[in-house]
Amino acid sequence: MAAPTVTMQQLIEAGSHFGHQTHRWNPRMKPYIFGARNGVHIIDLSQTVPLMARALDFVHATANAGGKVLFVGTKRQAQEPIAEAARSSGQHFVNHRWLGGMLTNWQTISKSIKELKSLEEQLSGETHGLTKKEVLNLTRKRDKLELSLGGIRDMGGVPDVMVVIDANKEDLAIKEANVLGIPVVGILDTNVDPSGIAFPVPGNDDAARAVRLYCDAFAQAASKNGGGANVGEMENPPVEATADA
């Protein structure tokens, strides 16, 4: 099946064209800016549509070839959509805090994942012989590891592509991917540096509805059985939200 599509109309309705205030821009985003309105940069969606299609095609081809897709979005608006995108497509995610070395020091991260699974096994079985305080401490340790590593617990190695919401906030993740030669798909607002992004997709990265649109599209692309659908035809369309200029 073909990769999913995102239309100009869907991007407009989601507020994807609203960038940040003009004084907050990154000059390297100039090629993707249409102009300014009321002190806010307007993103050129005539570029976003084909660039989004290119990124979706790449993610779709990677997933179909058995590749691993890692979704990264730790800002508040992205946390839930990112996790849902990964779970619905059978892929992987980081939506809490990027731990230094998550990719470049995978061996250590793997040990922490093993510890998480061991704690889960221990707590799911008989815990008599342990005091209430010991059980509480083990539970807290498990919960902390789950928050950081739960989304990559079954990744089994570094991913084949990374999809990022907000290149500024996830700069450490992008740097690690660049070091390892992992291609990065990035939603780029007008205040970010597009360097290191193999598949740039200019668009608002703050409005909840826009973030949901991107995540839904990439979730379909990353699903081995998905693709081919128009994202706007979903049964539960994203809820409207105001763009944060």
Swiss-Prot record:
GO terms for molecular function: structural constituent of ribosome. It holds the Pfam family Ribosomal_S2. Signal peptide: none annotated. The keyword Acetylation does not apply. The keyword Cytoplasm does not apply. Keywords: Ribonucleoprotein, Ribosomal protein. GO terms for biological process: translation. NCBIfam families: rpsB_bact (TIGR01011). Belongs to the universal ribosomal protein uS2 family. This is Small ribosomal subunit protein uS2. It comes from Erythrobacter litoralis (strain HTCC2594).
